[in-house]
A protein has these predicted regions:
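Canonical positions in the second alpha-helix
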Residues: 50-51, 84-85, 118-119
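Short coil turns that delineate tetratricopeptide repeat
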Residues: 55-56, 90, 124
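Register position in tetratricopeptide repeats
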Residues: 36-37, 70-72, 105-106, 135-137
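Canonical tetratricopeptide repeat
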Residues: 63-64, 98, 128, 132
């Protein structure tokens, strides 16, 4: 009995040891194809897996992952990825708009207002950010 349990444990360990992560380039390509097909759940899954593998280093994919998370009604995840895009200064106005939208969906009104103000400071005159401000003042 002990040998059977040991054999099963050894097989599981070997399987995990030799398991390979999905190819990052393939994840990005699959995610982009899913995004173009408006399959936001699939795109979100591919992009978030890629970002986990690469330690959230890709600002473009982080932004796209935020868009997908927003489309599938996952505001906490959208906030995380839009925040990465803001920190890396990618597509800054839209990243701030996405971040603010996620905060609004999470009913974090003070942070929502602060994000819009921060977005306007970083993007003076942005029409979308400017149009959101009268709604909160």
């Amino acid at each position: 009995m002990k040998k059977l349990i040991l054999s099963i444990a050894l097989c599981c360990a070997a399987t995990n040891f030799f398991a390979q992560n999905a190819d990052p380039a393939q994840l990005v390509n699959d995610g982009k194809a899913a995004l173009e097909a408006k399959n936001y759940q699939e795109a979100y899954t591919k992009f978030s897996t890629y970002l986990t593998q690469t330690n959230n280093q890709d600002s473009v994919i982080a932004y796209n992952c935020g868009v997908c998370a927003d489309k599938i009604k996952k505001p906490a995840e959208a906030l995380k990825y839009f925040d990465i895009a803001v920190q890396k200064k990618y597509n800054l106005a839209n990243a701030y708009i996405g971040k603010a939208g996620a905060l609004k969906d999470l009913k974090k009104n003070d942070e929502y207002v602060a994000t819009l103000k921060e977005g306007l400071e970083a993007n003076p005159g942005n029409k979308t950010l400017t149009n959101c401000m009268p709604l909160i003042t």
